[in-house]
């Protein structure tokens, strides 16, 4: 088992840590703030627009100007997989106007709690207040 260090406890960092842990790695997640997902708390006016349920081709044609750049990433882990991930993590979601996906509770804190449950289940080591990052700290 190799050791993986993920720097940053935002949504991308938490997902990266989960993916690495679920692929058999010992993962340490470093976050400079006092809690994970700090900026996520304020997204969507505190509700957290998780994803969009539109067909991927519709999304690419209406939003993206450089479709080729993100095409493979979006199809490797699509919006339905994001919805499934959160529902399996115990977070029920709802589809609102414009195909926007929100937690049923309308609280971004529930999105963060769902991610933290998965991090804990996957035994990811979390180090908060880790602003200075160097080899000696890992």
Give the ranges of each region predicted by the language model.
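Residue-level detector of alpha-helical segments with a strong bias toward transmembrane helices
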Residues: 23, 54-56, 133
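Phosphate-coordination loops involved in phosphoryl transfer and adenosine-cofactor binding
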Residues: 1, 96, 129
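Conserved N-terminal/central alpha/beta ligand/cofactor-binding core
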Residues: 32-125
């Amino acid at each position: 088992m190799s050791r993986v260090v993920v720097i940053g406890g935002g949504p991308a960092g938490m997902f990266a840590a989960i993916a690495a842990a679920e692929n058999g790695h010992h993962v340490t997640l470093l976050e400079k703030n006092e809690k994970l997902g700090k900026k996520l708390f304020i997204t969507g006016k505190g509700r957290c627009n998780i994803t969009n349920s539109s067909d991927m081709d519709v999304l690419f044609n209406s939003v993206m100007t450089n479709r080729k750049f993100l095409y493979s990433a979006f199809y490797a882990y699509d919006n339905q997989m994001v919805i499934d991930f959160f529902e399996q993590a115990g977070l029920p979601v709802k589809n609102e106007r414009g195909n926007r996906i929100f937690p049923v509770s309308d609280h971004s804190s529930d999105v963060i709690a769902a991610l933290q449950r998965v991090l804990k289940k996957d035994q990811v080591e979390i180090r908060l207040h880790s602003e200075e990052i160097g080899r000696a700290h890992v």
